[in-house]
Swiss-Prot record:
The gene is thiG. It is an enzyme of class 2 (transferase). Homotetramer. Forms heterodimers with either ThiH or ThiS. 1-deoxy-D-xylulose 5-phosphate binds at G157, A184, G185, N206, T207. This is Thiazole synthase. One of its GO terms (biological process) is thiamine diphosphate biosynthetic process.
């Protein structure tokens, strides 16, 4: 199982907590997913109202690790401040760092992301950066102290799957010892299987489950898909070929 900043997690599936039809459905989806980590919006908890307290109680009862995020932050200052709030609220140094650069695509701001990651790492945070598959950006993030990388598969909430297989495969080859998590854009269990087959350590998703007609069933489907992909990656899959190759022996074939 993946090891993030010295902590071994119980599952390769990480699940977000937003946009579920009800708290009961959220809890059921988590149970069916066997997810080991729940991502939680800091802004949702910062208000301190009863609904927020009830939600936090629900997450605690699930018995999963909590990864707070800085979703919705568009500047370094905003992201760093939100991360500091998260450490106070959740008593953890883990932070999923998001610094958004474009409103339409929700694409990460690479410059702000590196700057914020450097500040947070220096302050003792264990940063999980939401990034693209850009190799140079990921090198900079590792240089400033990130020991996990979370490249997107596609823009948040699109469900398009893995838009750049080449880039994701290259990233895996370049960082063989760094935990890599495909974050964002997954819509189907087959997308998660594909990420695992590329050798990624985990996947993080939210909308694909929360917006499904049956979130609990979809969560279970993703759990099975992640398991299948990880098993396949560890089984040394055959190499793809451009030309056909017979699978049955020709020795002893009758000569007509």
């Amino acid at each position: 199982m993946p090891i993030f900043y010295g902590t071994e997690v119980t599952s390769r599936l990480m699940l977000g907590t937003a946009q579920y039809p009800s708290p009961a459905i959220l809890a059921d989806a988590f149970r069916r997913s066997d997810a080991g980590i729940a991502t939680v919006s800091v802004r949702r908890e910062a208000g301190g109202d009863q609904a927020g307290q009830d939600f936090w109680g629900l997450i605690r009862d699930l018995g999963v690790a909590v990864l707070p995020n800085t979703a919705g932050c568009y500047s370094v200052r905003e992201a760093v401040t939100t991360a500091q709030m998260a450490r106070e609220l959740f008593d953890t140094n883990w932070i999923k760092l998001e610094v958004i650069g474009h409103t339409d695509t929700l694409q990460p701001d690479p410059f702000g992301l590196v700057e914020a990651a450097a500040q947070l790492a220096e302050d003792g945070f264990e940063v999980f950066p939401y990034c693209t598959e850009d190799l140079v950006l990921c090198e900079r993030l590792v240089e400033v102290g990130c020991k996990v990388l979370m490249p997107w598969g596609a823009p948040i909430g699109t469900g398009l799957g893995l838009n750049n297989i080449y880039g994701l495969r290259s990233l895996r080859a370049h960082f063989p010892d760094t935990p890599l998590v495909v974050d964002a854009g997954l819509g189907l269990p087959s997308h998660a299987t594909q990420a695992m087959e590329l050798g990624y350590d985990a996947v993080l998703l939210n909308t694909a489950v929360s917006k499904a007609g049956d979130p609990a069933a979809m969560a279970h489907a993703f759990a099975l898909a992640v398991e299948a992909g990880a098993l396949a990656a560890g089984a040394d899959p055959m190499d793809a070929r451009d030309m056909a190759a017979p699978s049955t022996p020709v020795f002893g074939k009758a000569m007509l």
